[in-house]
Amino acid sequence: MGYISTIKTAVQLFPFLAFLLTLPYMILNYRKYGSVNKLRVLIFYSFILYLMTVYLLVILPLPDPSKIHTSYSEMVNLQPFAFVVDFFKKSPFDLAQTGTWIQALKHPTFYVPAFNVLMLIPFGMYLRYYFKCGFKKTILLTALFSLFLELTQLSGLYFMYPGPYRLADVDDIIQNTTGCGVGYLLGWFLVWLLPTRDEIDEHSFRVGTRVSGFRMGLAFLIDFVMLSLLYAVIERLETIPYVAVLAVYFALIPLWRGKTLGMALLKFRLHFDKQKWLRTIWRGILVVGYFYLIPQGLFYLISLLNSDLTDNSLLTLSMILLLFFALLLYLILTLAIVLLNRRFPFDRLAGAEYESTVRVKKELLKDETESSK
């Protein structure tokens, strides 16, 4: 498997890893900043794709274990700069003959070390730009990362193979670290071109002072998932209507500090100008009606009418279509509220507002207050 094939494999596997990381990543961002910054998302996922590509380049292709008969001692090189000696000994390079220069560039003794240098250049750029590492820290982290890759090879993919199937080479660490140093120097371009990490953080905090529709929607999703898991356990102990569990959860739990578990996880809470207890309970009942009773009622009516449907029941078919469009309208409305940062109908009826509980610097809060006036 060549370099291009390995990179294609990384690109194909990336969506699955991205899917697994999305929910935890969003929760961490909401907890830390109160918002999910688009540029930060782009940087994060590109960094994950890059790391996955590097890792796969190190371990692929995976050989047949029955064909591995190597020992650990013969698959390790601890002599530094052996690649320089190999280049002058094995490549066709001759300083006096310019015609050999291009041939030397195509020889493995040149392009393999060159690729090792190039492979870690982006790592240095990421460390300088986004992670704000100094030069010494960048070099140290790169050396450790490269050492991890070499130990992965030396261990035969963490002893899954009877022996190493690739050479663990100290020269690889030298080349990788050199590449990262070059990447660190090139990182000034990203610092000049893109907003700084501090500017990204500041913008995230500013946006996070207001609870977005997506943040609310994610909190509701977390609440309903946790309640469904909880109900699966409670139902075995005692028969309790699911709607009753929902009503107790959304109407009574927020009476304590104005939060459900989903809200607490994403760091925001309910706020009422007056009649907090009464409005909280009223809102909880409306939440159950909106997210459970309305869709369940529509599904029930559609199922009921469908069971009585005959070839000549045009009226019944029309009613089913009408209910289906009502359900579709409900879904579109809910999605629009989340994406357009609008308030849910139950929040409007109950007079509920949301407050972010993410800690923000006083200077940012002051600027945000002045800009909203």
What are these regions (language model features)?
Residues 1-164, 181-266, 272-373:
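Bulky hydrophobic segments
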Residues 167-178:
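Individual transmembrane alpha-helices with interfacial aromatic-anchor signatures
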